[in-house]
């Protein structure tokens, strides 16, 4: 299933702001949520609908509601938390499954340290969120985990993706749709996306930002 790069003008503008070296923690957090919300809008555009009747102000009226599978949002900790509020602003009824995966900075391999999936996840559409798709190790490990739990329909939302990470996910899980705000140039020798956003987790949580 091909990757989709969402080139909406609002996304292009907000992503440009996020790439600034001098961006504040507050602004980066807010923009991550906003772009996450727009990606969610795109990722749910094909959800099935069903009709039902309600009492309107002038009498009975037929309206629509989302039908089919319920949704679980799966942030990859810790950086995925930075997109969560933006996603839930559009699908507030979704349940949250948390996955903790850290990257070994020497081998770039993914190491799982937390798995908290909602009950009956096999009956849900899983939407994975993570700001960066770099080597693809964390994303592949998360998809492996979800499929092992019985989840059959999975989508992923990332702010920025590297070609290397896209290739890794497509090779391991060609059935998973990835939506991104930008397909960037490459990975550097340290496994960071170029031009990328820097360390999204550090920027979201203010790890290295100076106190004001």
Swiss-Prot record:
**Gene designation:** upp
Q: Which reaction does it catalyse?
A: UMP + diphosphate = 5-phospho-alpha-D-ribose 1-diphosphate + uracil
Regulation of activity: Allosterically activated by GTP.
Q: Which NCBIfam families match?
A: PRK00129.1, upp
Family as reported in the entry's similarity comment: Belongs to the UPRTase family.
The yes or no answer to whether the keyword Transferase is present is yes
Keyword GTP-binding assigned to the entry: answer is yes
GO terms of molecular function: GTP binding; magnesium ion binding; uracil phosphoribosyltransferase activity
Which residues does the annotation say bind uracil? 193, 198-200
**Which residues are listed for 5-phospho-alpha-D-ribose 1-diphosphate binding in this entry?**
78, 103, 130-138, 199
Q: What is its EC number?
A: 2.4.2.9
Q: From the record, give the transmembrane residue ranges.
A: none
Disulfide bridge positions per record: none
What is this organism's lineage?
Bacteria, Pseudomonadati, Pseudomonadota, Gammaproteobacteria, Pseudomonadales
A Pfam family hit = UPRTase
**Note describing how the cofactor binds:** Binds 1 Mg(2+) ion per subunit. The magnesium is bound as Mg-PRPP.
The identity of this protein, by name, is Uracil phosphoribosyltransferase
Q: In which pathway does it act?
A: Pyrimidine metabolism; UMP biosynthesis via salvage pathway; UMP from uracil: step 1/1
